[in-house]
């Protein structure tokens, strides 16, 4: 709380290891306004309303009312007509609720801009940077990131999607063609049950680094993993830290798919971060920003990827190639999506037209077209607009998204290092995790062997490496 921050700052005690923590406390004190307490309370109520509206959405599918997530498997169907029906059914509720969601966002927008002005800022974008303790990069850096993604990643994504179009043998790639396996291979079932899942994952992490493998084995032995999907279990996946015990806890809903393997690799990265940072004496010294937290998780996805084939890992050689190809293509696709979401939010809160619902929709289409190439949206303008209404971050966690892009660029550098010297790359990765929050973001990235960078030159080098690896894998799978 701000009151606790005031008391701690008033003590006047500081050391180099506490510098980042004290700076965060001072910033929280500086931007706090009593008048904003009811504003943020009202925003929480509006956020709950958004979740009620979207959480209750259903679609009729083959005579049954189904929650929208249950339509996802049909987007992978080899039957294109089935995919199109599933896509339209899943999008329709958002188009029907567009008026309600737009009205809800009108209120959120006004409250956020008011909170920013009451705290002495010109707009909510400018308020967010100190509020999120973004000390090491600026709004201008984010705009450089957008431009770099447009220049280097968007053309690569266009090439990836053109390859998909040719494999699917369609005249134009439509939005319902993006999830299906273009090779129409049999679905991969990497494990049968949670025992096999954890046993295999333990072997994988031991191959990455014996100390990381031992930490994961500790989680298995101490029952700090809840991985199976079951009736009545909350959705999603995450890693939580049990600070008193100095242990992480991983929660997810595994059903035996490739995505489950990648989710566990990701969450294990957070878990290894928790183990390493626990050596820092204070809780505040253990939690860096999301840019560093996601560096830990995204790097582990890539560091572990080389060990996922049998006899150590989950996949046959052919399955491993397919899973690796999908993962690397997803890395590129996600970067363009992240850039478009952040650029859109920047426009909303800095443009005089941000309060206008129609102008927001038009801006989304314009910005989306800037980054997203290779998909034919003709006749689907309303569906394309609906995409931002289901991006819950825009409604619930404004400006919390570019962190994923920044971390992905860092993780790709860690991965590049691992291709040259795997042991050294993992050692530096572990050194970075152990810093917790006692250093700034550039120093944490440097410890991991990466640069905190927003420029097109570095990003272009990494994209070239990813495309080279994609080409190598394609040459082996046909």
What do these predicted ranges mean?
Residues 1-187, 200:
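A well-structured
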Residues 26, 133-136, 228, 264, ...:
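C-terminal, non-catalytic "cap/extension" segments appended to globular domains
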Residues 31-32, 88-97, 137-143, 180-190, ...:
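Glycine- and acidic
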Residues 66-81, 183, 190-265, 269-274:
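Active-site-adjacent "gating/activation" loops or surface patches in catalytic cores
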Residues 151-152, 288-317, 327-328, 333, ...:
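Post-HExxH zinc-binding segment in Zn-dependent metallohydrolases
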Residues 164-184, 218-229, 289-292, 323-328, ...:
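A glycine-rich phosphate-binding loop feature that marks nucleotide/adenosyl-phosphate handling sites
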Residues 172-200, 273, 314, 319-322, ...:
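Long, K/E/R/D-enriched contiguous segments that form extended
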Residues 269-283, 303:
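Catalytic Zn2+-binding segment of zinc metalloproteases
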């Amino acid at each position: 709380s701000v009151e606790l921050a005031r008391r701690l700052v008033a003590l006047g005690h500081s050391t180099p290891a506490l510098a980042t923590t004290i700076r965060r406390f001072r910033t929280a004190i500086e931007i706090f306004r009593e008048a904003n307490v009811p504003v943020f309370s009202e925003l929480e109520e509006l956020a709950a309303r958004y979740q009620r509206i979207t959480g209750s959405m259903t679609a009729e599918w083959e005579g049954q009312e189904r929650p929208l997530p249950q339509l996802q498997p049909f987007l992978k169907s080899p039957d294109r007509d089935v995919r199109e029906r599933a896509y339209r059914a899943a999008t329709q509720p958002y188009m029907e609720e567009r008026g309600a969601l737009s009205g809800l966002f009108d209120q959120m927008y006004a409250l956020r801009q008011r909170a920013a002005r009451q705290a002495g800022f010109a707009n909510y974008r400018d308020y967010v940077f100190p509020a999120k303790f973004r000390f090491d990069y600026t709004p201008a850096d984010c705009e450089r990131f957008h431009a770099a993604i447009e220049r280097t990643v968007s053309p690569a994504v266009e090439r990836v999607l053109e390859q998909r179009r040719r494999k699917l043998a369609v005249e134009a790639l439509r939005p319902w063609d993006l999830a299906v396996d273009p090779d129409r291979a049999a679905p991969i079932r990497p494990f049968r049950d949670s025992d096999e899942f954890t046993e295999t994952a333990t072997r994988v992490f031991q191959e990455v680094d014996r100390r990381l493998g031992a930490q994961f084995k500790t989680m298995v032995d101490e029952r700090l993993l809840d991985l199976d999907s079951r009736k009545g279990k909350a959705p999603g996946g995450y890693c939580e830290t049990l600070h008193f015990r100095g242990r992480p806890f991983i929660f997810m809903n595994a059903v035996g798919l490739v995505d489950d393997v990648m989710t566990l690799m990701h969450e294990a990265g957070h878990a290894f971060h928790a183990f390493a940072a626990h050596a820092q004496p204070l809780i505040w010294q253990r939690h860096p920003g999301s840019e560093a937290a996601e560096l830990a998780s995204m790097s582990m996805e890539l560091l572990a990827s080389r060990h996922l084939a049998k006899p150590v890992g989950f996949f046959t050689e052919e399955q491993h190639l397919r899973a690796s190809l999908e993962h690397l293509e997803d890395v590129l696709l996600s970067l363009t999506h992240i850039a478009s979401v952040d650029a859109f939010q920047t426009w909303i809160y800095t443009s005089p037209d941000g309060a206008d619902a129609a102008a927001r929709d038009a801006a989304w289409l314009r910005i989306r077209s800037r980054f997203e190439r290779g998909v034919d949206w003709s006749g689907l303008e309303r569906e394309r607009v609906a995409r931002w209404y289901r991006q819950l971050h825009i409604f619930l966690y404004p400006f919390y998204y570019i962190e994923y892009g920044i971390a992905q660029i860092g993780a790709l550098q860690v991965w590049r290092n691992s291709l040259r010297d795997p042991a050294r790359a993992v050692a530096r990765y572990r050194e970075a995790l152990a810093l917790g929050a006692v250093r700034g973001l550039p120093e944490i990235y440097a410890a991991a062997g990466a640069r905190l960078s927003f420029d097109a030159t570095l990003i272009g080098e990494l994209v070239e490496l990813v495309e080279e690896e994609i080409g190598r894998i394609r040459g082996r799978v046909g």
